[in-house]
């Protein structure tokens, strides 16, 4: 069970002292230790596990340094590899190992000091790192890093989430029957709800009021990144924030005197991995989220829609909407406790730890209710969904939904396709200053296979920004160059 949760956000200006990454992570760990409300808890932690932190990767053993700074004498120090799903997989493993008796108390921590380091680097200031002795043992590693993209996508440079999620969004727009203008307004309202949640979150990076109109309107300070997304719709990794939770056996918590009203029980979790985008049958939905949702609901003995508190992985609006639709949640309902990865902040792989920390507090204030947290890696490629409550189940249950995911129908990719194809989805990529770079199209061949194309004609790409291009035809060459047929 989870007995404690802590978060820490630091905001510094250029020239001001900033906590380096392990110190920031340790601040969240100390907050979790204090949240347990008992003495002696630091001495009871036998494993400190750090979700892969990009800003802490230069240390010989970052989780060891975090433990030392937090006053924890753990026997094990772990880096958990992976993407945005990693907080979910780390919690599952900790629960399983505690039930098996191999551990009694595990501290999970995630975070990034990306903003302060970027600030210093842009100003040409040296970033001071605490030096660990040369003979410092390396951390144990859990999990693996995987390639999230198909080779054909990689060959065209379509590898970044900001290129991928807009394609899902345009496909969703078609299913919803929105014109581009209507959908832009819809996205503004959707993101405004996240902004409102962030305003009540003391740890959120951006607690300013952002209206639907402001969010939806492209402007110099809110330029398009990949249509239809403006900057105020997408994850902000330029943050300094960390979160931590402590997972513990009932026996250890009882012995330490941690009050039962602090306890939150993970009831069940399920996970899976999707096919690459090239092979997914449709782009507006997710077999992965659907089957993972079915699995976790069956294990928990209640529907996902029964969760009173929800925090979905929130890197882009399409990620949240697709998850909500597949899990049976209201896409227009409250889907984030924190404010999501744009307004609360998107510390790379670690965001879902903030979701778990916020969920602990939400469930404590609403005893007996159920919460749901999702953790997503890649382009809705790896997903973990966890249901939690202050009311315990007999034991924690976990299942992989992979067999059902693998058995689902999929689409064939037309590698090296040459000829006319019909646009299935698209996005126009923008860079600094609002400059158009190109347009990415996903198309269907006459035999209903999928093909990728990149339109480098800037006039053609500009024409696609405000117009509905789904169903229009393009000509694709074998190297992936696409040209308009309109």
Go through the PLM ranges and name each one.
Residues 1-79, 96-103, 107-239, 243-245, ...:
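Conserved "HGTGT" condensation-loop signature of ketosynthase/thiolase-family condensing enzymes
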Residues 78-86:
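General structural concept
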Residues 83, 92-97:
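An acidic, phosphate/nucleotide-engaging active-site surface
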Residues 344-352, 363, 368:
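A conserved active-site cap/scaffold subdomain adjacent to cofactor or substrate pockets
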Residues 371-373:
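Active-site capping/gating regions of soluble enzymes
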Residues 381:
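Gly/Pro-rich active-site capping loops and adjacent beta-alpha segments
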């Amino acid at each position: 069970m989870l007995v404690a949760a802590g978060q820490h956000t630091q905001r510094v200006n250029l020239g001001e002292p900033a906590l380096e990454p392990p110190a920031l992570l340790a601040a969240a760990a100390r907050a979790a230790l204090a949240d347990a409300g008992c003495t002696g808890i630091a001495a009871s932690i036998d494993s400190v596990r750090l979700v892969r932190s990009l800003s802490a990767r230069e240390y010989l053993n970052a989780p060891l340094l975090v433990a030392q700074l937090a006053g924890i004498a753990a026997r094990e120090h772990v880096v958990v590899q992976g993407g945005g799903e990693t907080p979910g997989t780390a919690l599952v493993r900790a629960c399983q190992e505690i039930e098996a008796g191999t551990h009694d108390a595990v501290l999970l921590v995630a975070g990034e000091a990306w903003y302060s380091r970027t600030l210093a680097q842009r100003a040409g200031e040296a970033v001071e790192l605490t030096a660990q002795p040369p003979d410092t043992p390396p951390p144990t590693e859990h999990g693996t890093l995987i390639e999230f993209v198909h080779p054909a996508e990689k060959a065209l440079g379509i590898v970044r989430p900001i290129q991928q999620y807009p394609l899902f969004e345009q496909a969703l727009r078609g299913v919803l029957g929105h014109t581009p203008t209507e959908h832009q307004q819809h996205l503004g309202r959707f993101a405004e709800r996240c902004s409102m949640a962030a305003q009540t979150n003391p740890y959120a990076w951006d607690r300013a009021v952002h209206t639907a109109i402001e969010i939806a309107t492209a402007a110099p300070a809110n330029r398009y990144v990949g249509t239809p997304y403006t900057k105020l719709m997408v994850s902000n990794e330029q943050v300094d924030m960390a979160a931590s939770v402590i997972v513990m056996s009932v026996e250890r918590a009882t012995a330490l005197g941690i009050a039962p009203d602090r306890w939150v029980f993970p009831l069940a979790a399920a996970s899976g991995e999707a096919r690459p985008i090239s092979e997914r049958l449709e782009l507006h939905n997710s077999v992965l989220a659907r089957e993972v949702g079915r699995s976790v609901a069956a294990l928990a003995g209640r529907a996902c829609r029964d969760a009173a508190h929800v925090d979905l992985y929130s890197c882009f609006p399409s990620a949240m909407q697709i998850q909500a639709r597949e899990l049976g949640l209201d896409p227009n309902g409250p889907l984030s406790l924190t404010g999501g990865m744009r307004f609360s902040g998107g510390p790379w792989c670690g965001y879902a730890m903030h979701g778990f920390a916020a969920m602990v507090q939400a469930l404590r204030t609403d005893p007996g209710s159920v919460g749901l947290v999702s953790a997503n890696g890649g382009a809705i490629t790896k997903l973990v969904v966890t249901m939690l409550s202050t009311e315990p189940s007999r034991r924690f249950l976990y299942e992989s939904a992979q067999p059902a995911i693998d058995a689902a129908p999929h689409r064939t990719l037309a590698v090296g396709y040459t000829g006319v194809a019909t646009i299935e989805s698209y996005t126009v990529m923008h860079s600094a200053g609002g400059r158009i770079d190109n347009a990415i199209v996903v198309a269907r061949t006459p035999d209903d296979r999928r093909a990728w194309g990149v339109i480098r004609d800037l006039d053609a790409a500009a024409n696609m920004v405000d117009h509905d291009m789904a169903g229009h035809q393009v000509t694709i060459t074998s190297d992936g160059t696409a040209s308009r047929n309109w």
